[in-house]
UniProtKB/Swiss-Prot annotation:
The protein's name: MOB kinase activator 3B
Lineage, highest ranks first: Eukaryota, Metazoa, Chordata, Craniata, Vertebrata
GO biological process, one term: signal transduction
Keyword Zinc applies: yes
GO cellular component: cytoplasm; nucleus
Amino acid sequence: MSIALKQVFNKDKTFRPKRKFEPGTQRFELHKRAQASLNSGVDLKAAVQLPSGEDQNDWVAVHVVDFFNRINLIYGTICEFCTERTCPVMSGGPKYEYRWQDDLKYKKPTALPAPQYMNLLMDWIEVQINNEDIFPTCVGVPFPKNFLQICKKILCRLFRVFVHVYIHHFDRVIVMGAEAHVNTCYKHFYYFVTEMNLIDRKELEPLKEMTSRMCH
């Protein structure tokens, strides 16, 4: 990453604190392998494939945490331009509106301003990935039976952040010189969720044209 991009994606801009893996553990090694996929020249399509002999849940877990860290960093770089005035409803253009629902305050799908939606989303994901019953950090502790379903929901909602950033705020990304980095993050995300079949194709529709040009 260039010096300019490092300044754009600095730790002060992180929307949420990073969740990390313990050095020396199997998941830390998988995390390093996943991280290496952002190095220039790496074949992202090949990099996301489950390594031989590795557990699928471990592979998905390290990627979900990694994508959460990266995407909240991307949103953090433009969040000052994403306000209740500029984005009164969380959307991806005129055709796609995303409503928030959880098991707490919002029992029914509710239209919210984009920044409020993003805050609720990042809070919700943080709770999931910091829950030892869902994302166990101790080696040998099994993942729950519904682990992949939870991950699918997390990734589906993270994809909506990409949709909103690309459609409503990509001009700011370009001004900051971060276009190449964001595009690489998106390609990595797209190749992973399609390789592992973690997002319904209908959810990917808002960026379909862009994706067809970017991800061959």
